[in-house]
């Protein structure tokens, strides 16, 4: 058993050493390749940035006007330092603004452009030549669907009472009761109908002439019954128009209409106004490129 373990350990150690011997050179070569690629990229970037900086300095020199020199109030007291840049002017020539400064605010939007001209109609499409097999539907069964019986439902509520049964047989007559006492006299009956009027009697003998009375006149008699209604009068003139009534409540909003078709796209607007300066960037120190240009 010990021999087997020693042999296994030795074999594993040998394999590990061989793997290290093959892996280390490969890693070394990979690291060197990456190092060379990084150096090449840095060199190319440096060449491009130097070329861009030189072009920017040329544009700055030809476009930007020179600034006025600063007046030092101590020039009359202290001795001025000699200028080492003999080819440069006596004032500060600032370099162009670095791109680290924040840009200005965007300009206002331009006016909408005129609608473009409609495009030419496209060519006629090809006819559809694809054919499809006829669709066949499975026959529909007209048999009733047989569902399995469900479980028994709960007991229903008690029903209403049934109808009354038939009358029973009449019972035997009872014994005659004792005669009752006399009742109270009843109320008088209604008056009978009036009889027919009798025949007119013979006219009486004329009476003696009466004497004119000398008493005061009697009072006015009771007012008579109202007479029949008179004919309807003519229609009166139409009355004036009444004041207008208050405004009624506003009706409910109607349903929204269908959306209209999209309009033609407008032409591109004009260029916006230049934005304001966001911040002031101090002038960087003079570089050797600027000195070499002068």
UniProtKB/Swiss-Prot annotation:
Pfam families, A to Z: Col_cuticle_N
Similarity annotation: Belongs to the cuticular collagen family.
Annotated segments matching region Disordered: 100-133, 149-278
Chain intervals with Low complexity compositional bias: 164-209, 225-265
GO annotation, biological process: larval development
Record has Aminoacyl-tRNA synthetase as a keyword: no
Tissues and organs where the protein is expressed, per its UniProt entry: Expressed in hypodermal cells.
Keyword terms, alphabetized: Collagen, Cuticle, Disulfide bond, Repeat, Signal
Gene Ontology cellular-component terms listed: collagen trimer
Molecular function per GO: structural constituent of cuticle
Biased composition (Pro residues): 100-112
InterPro entries: Col_cuticle_N
Annotated Gly residues bias: 210-224
Signal peptide (from-to): 1-30
Protein name, per record: Cuticle collagen 10
Record function comment: Nematode cuticles are composed largely of collagen-like proteins. The cuticle functions both as an exoskeleton and as a barrier to protect the worm from its environment.
Region described as Triple-helical region: 102-127, 153-274
Assembly description: Collagen polypeptide chains are complexed within the cuticle by disulfide bonds and other types of covalent cross-links.
């Amino acid at each position: 058993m010990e021999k087997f373990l020693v042999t296994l350990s030795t074999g594993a150690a040998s394999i590990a050493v061989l793997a290290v011997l093959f892996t280390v050179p490969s890693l070394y070569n990979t690291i060197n390749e990456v190092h060379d690629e990084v150096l090449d990229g840095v060199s190319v970037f440096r060449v491009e940035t130097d070329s861009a900086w030189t072009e920017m300095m040329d544009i700055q020199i030809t476009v930007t006007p020179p600034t006025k020199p600063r007046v030092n109030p101590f020039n009359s007291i202290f001795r001025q330092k000699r200028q080492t840049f003999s080819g440069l002017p006596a004032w500060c020539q600032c370099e162009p603004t670095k791109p680290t400064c924040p840009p200005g605010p965007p300009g206002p939007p331009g006016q909408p452009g005129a609608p473009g001209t409609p495009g030419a109609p496209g060519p006629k499409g090809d006819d559809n030549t694809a054919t499809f097999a006829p669709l066949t539907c499975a026959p529909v069964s007209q048999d009733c669907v047989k569902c399995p019986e469900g479980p028994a439902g709960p007991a229903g509520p008690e029903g209403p009472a049934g109808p009354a049964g038939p009358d029973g047989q009449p019972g035997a007559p009872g014994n005659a009761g004792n005669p009752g006492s006399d009742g109270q006299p009843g109320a008088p009956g209604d008056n009978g109908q009036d009889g027919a009027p009798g025949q007119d009697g013979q006219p009486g003998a004329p009476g003696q002439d009466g004497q004119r009375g000398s008493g005061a006149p009697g009072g006015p008699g009771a007012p008579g019954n109202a007479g029949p209604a008179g004919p309807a009068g003519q229609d009166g003139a139409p009355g004036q128009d009444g004041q207008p009534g208050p405004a009624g409540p506003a009706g409910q909003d109607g349903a929204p209409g269908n959306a209209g078709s999209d309009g033609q796209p407008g032409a591109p607007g004009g260029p916006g106004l230049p934005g304001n300066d966001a911040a002031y960037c101090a002038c960087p120190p003079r570089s050797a490129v600027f000195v070499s240009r002068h």
